[in-house]
């Protein structure tokens, strides 16, 4: 548990069910400025391939294949750990601002962390330093190594999937520096594309890339993306996660029961049931128990009666508490199946956390990207998590939109001088 990172965290205040499909793909090579070269990773052993017709696992063969895979991944840098504490501290600083109560919310700290990391490569001066301070990064070199290690350590592609992806979409006629795209590709595995902002063509290209990277889980949100002709840059990070439980729930034991929301209202939901020996953490105001997945684990936190999830998340260091020492217990699970998705506007949250210059056309410094003025117009994140008897599927994307700063100048006010009632006038000579 010491190295656990919060990939996605959420509060289920009331059940919300939703569904969406994936859109048609678009060939993005026609827009490519710089395409990232991903590491050539070996294929992970497929758990099901080592099971016989009765579902019995050949453990010796599977463990041998898994050890071989892990050795090969370590040679490619998989064992070179990022600073997990830095990511947890960032998550602790941001979750309390995002989970304010009243509604279901899903948030990926890692997705925002990586997106802001890319933003530091495109900014300079105090604009950059404010983002670096929020990320807890000592310098640009350390942050680059951190993000690269994070990308590699998160990566999993086999019977369980966990992967990050990054992209920068630039306005096709914008005067931007090639070095910016080169840096993003080298350190962030980010591809850069030029698209005709403000057109359906650009909207489809961006939505297609996002759908491909998130398994189509957020196609409803990506289908609503509308670029603007003033957009200079649209920066994206995605995370996609899919893994089965090591000990699945049995569908035959799933029963309808009552879920009580924070406001006391009741809803019917399908609850999955299972008893297993596992870890439990008894914390101040809550009980936490992780359920193991084929890639990582999902920690469920049940607040004590009278304690809200939001109050726990607002507590300094709460997510770090969840990496503490657990004890063994027989865990009797009763978990609702759920499918929750949300979109969160992060602009005001980031400003409250000290990132202000990037949003100010007079202060923003985007000289590593362009010699013309630019500023961040909006930052948002969409996320979705589904769990059922078999396992967990989750996806998120963070979007940072930057415009030409000149395009953000407010138009002059309109003042009507309709002299249809008594009025004054004064004539001045030309020396006044």
Regions found by a protein language model. Name each.
Residues 1-8:
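Bacterial N-terminal signal peptides that target proteins for export
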């Amino acid at each position: 548990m010491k190295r656990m990172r919060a990939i996605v965290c959420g509060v289920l205040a009331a059940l919300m069910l939703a569904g969406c499909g994936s859109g048609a793909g678009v060939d993005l090579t026609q827009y490519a400025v710089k395409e990232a070269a991903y590491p050539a990773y070996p294929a992970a052993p497929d758990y099901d391939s080592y099971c016989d017709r009765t579902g019995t696992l050949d453990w010796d063969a599977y463990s041998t294949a898994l050890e071989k895979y892990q050795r090969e991944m370590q040679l490619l840098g998989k064992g070179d750990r990022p600073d997990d504490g830095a990511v947890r501290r960032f998550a602790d600083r941001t979750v309390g601002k995002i989970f304010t109560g009243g509604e279901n919310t899903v948030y990926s700290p890692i997705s925002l962390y990586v997106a802001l990391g890319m933003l530091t490569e495109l900014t300079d001066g105090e604009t950059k330093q404010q983002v670096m301070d929020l990320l807890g990064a000592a310098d640009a070199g350390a942050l680059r190594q951190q993000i690269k290690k994070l990308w590699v350590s998160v990566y999993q592609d086999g019977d369980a999937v966990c992967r990050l992806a990054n992209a920068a979409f630039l306005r096709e006629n914008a005067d931007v520096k090639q070095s910016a795209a080169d840096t993003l590709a080298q350190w962030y595995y980010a591809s850069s594309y030029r698209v005709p902002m403000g057109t359906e063509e650009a909207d489809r290209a961006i939505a297609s890339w996002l759908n491909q990277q998130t398994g189509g889980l957020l196609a409803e949100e990506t289908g609503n993306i509308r670029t603007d002709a003033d957009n200079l840059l649209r920066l994206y990070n995605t995370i996609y996660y899919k893994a089965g439980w090591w000990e699945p729930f049995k569908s035959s034991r799933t029963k309808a029961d009552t879920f009580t929301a924070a406001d006391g209202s009741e809803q019917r939901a399908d609850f999955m049931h299972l008893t297993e020996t596992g870890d439990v953490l008894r914390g101040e105001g809550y009980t936490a128990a992780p359920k193991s997945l084929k890639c990582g684990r999902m920690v469920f936190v049940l607040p004590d009666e009278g304690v809200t999830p939001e109050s726990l998340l607002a507590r300094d260091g709460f997510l770090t508490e969840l990496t503490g020492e657990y004890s063994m217990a027989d865990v009797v699970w009763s978990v609702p199946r759920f499918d929750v998705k949300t979109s969160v506007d992060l602009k005001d949250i980031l400003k409250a956390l000290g990132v202000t210059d990037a949003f100010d056309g007079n202060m923003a410094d985007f000289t590593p990207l362009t010699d013309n003025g630019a500023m961040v117009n909006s930052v948002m994140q969409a996320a979705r998590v589904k769990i059922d008897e078999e396992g967990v599927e989750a996806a998120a994307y963070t979007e940072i939109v930057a415009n030409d700063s000149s395009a953000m100048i407010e138009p002059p006010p309109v003042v009507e001088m309709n002299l249809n009632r008594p009025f004054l006038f004064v004539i001045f000579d030309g020396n006044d």
